[in-house]
Each structure stands twice: as structure tokens, then as C-alpha cells.
């Protein structure tokens, strides 16, 4: 009887860990695109979030740019990536239904319509001189979203990196 209880408890803990790992991710900031808010090497806790719950001003993690576009230096494109499968960290500037921010996003100056279309986001780095973002690429599709940054993780409290 006691062994069955221990087994059930262990199974419950294992399921909780799996669920947490699917909902949360720790990402290491690389590059200078989010200075001064986030510095290279800092780690942030990210919660998986559906695109429809985003608001302008939130910091998000999205799948990144696969490679530099023509005219960009590859080093600058690589600096935009976080750890994991090419994550980037950016601040949401506009969500579907918001006015297109033509004055701050040159790539969208000639975009059709007056509102950000459904399924698209406008994201910007806090440090424009070192950020590959919507200023150059225009809209990013919302399906690239992983989640919202909840907080920085204190390096002293986090587990050692491998």
C-alpha cells in the first residue's frame, strides 16, 4: 500500500514537471538589441502565451530570423538570437487591430491598410542600432510567438549552465 502511494506521488510530481516545462522556458539573452532593459547573458523566464493575449509594451520571445537578409552583416543577425531554436527577444509595438506604426517602422511605411492585420505583430528591440526587428523586416507572423517574458532570473538562484 505504501509503495503504491509513493509511486502515485512520484508520478504526480513527474506530470507536474512535464506540464511546467511545456508552459515555461528559460531563455538567455544574447546580443545588445534589448539594452538597457535586458543585457547579454541575463536569463529570463518566459511563459507560453497565445498571440491574442498580447498587449503593446510586453516583452516577448519569438522564433528568430534564420539568416541575415541581403545587405545585413551575418554577425548582427546572429546577435539577435537567444539560446534554443533561434529565439529572439523583442518588445511588442503593435498587435492585430492596432494602427500601423508607420512613423517608427520604416519597413511598414508603404504597408496596405491602416491597421495591423490579423495574425501579425510589430516587434522592436529597445536598442534600435543593434536590433534586427520589424523596422527592417516589417510584420512578424504571430505563429512565431513562444511567450511573454515574466521576469529576469537571478543568476545566483538559477541552476548552473551545462
Please place each PLM-identified region on the residue numbering:
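Extended hydrophobic leader/signal-anchor segments used for secretion and membrane insertion
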Residues: 1-162
Amino acid at each position: 500500500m505504501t509503495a503504491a502511494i509513493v509511486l502515485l506521488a512520484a508520478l504526480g510530481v513527474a506530470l507536474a514537471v512535464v506540464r511546467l516545462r511545456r508552459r515555461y522556458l528559460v531563455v538567455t539573452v544574447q546580443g545588445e538589441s534589448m539594452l538597457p532593459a535586458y543585457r547579454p547573458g541575463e536569463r529570463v523566464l518566459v511563459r507560453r502565451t497565445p498571440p491574442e493575449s498580447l498587449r503593446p509594451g510586453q516583452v516577448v520571445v519569438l522564433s528568430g530570423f534564420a539568416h541575415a537578409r541581403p545587405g545585413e552583416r551575418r554577425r548582427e543577425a546572429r546577435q539577435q538570437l537567444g539560446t534554443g531554436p533561434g529565439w529572439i527577444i523583442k518588445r511588442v509595438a503593435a498587435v492585430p487591430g492596432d494602427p500601423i506604426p508607420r512613423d517608427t517602422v520604416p519597413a511598414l511605411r508603404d504597408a496596405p491598410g491602416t491597421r495591423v492585420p490579423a495574425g501579425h505583430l510589430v516587434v522592436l528591440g529597445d536598442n534600435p542600432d543593434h536590433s534586427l526587428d520589424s523596422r527592417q523586416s516589417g510584420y512578424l507572423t504571430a505563429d512565431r510567438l513562444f511567450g511573454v517574458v515574466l521576469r529576469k532570473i537571478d543568476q545566483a538562484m538559477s541552476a548552473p549552465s551545462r
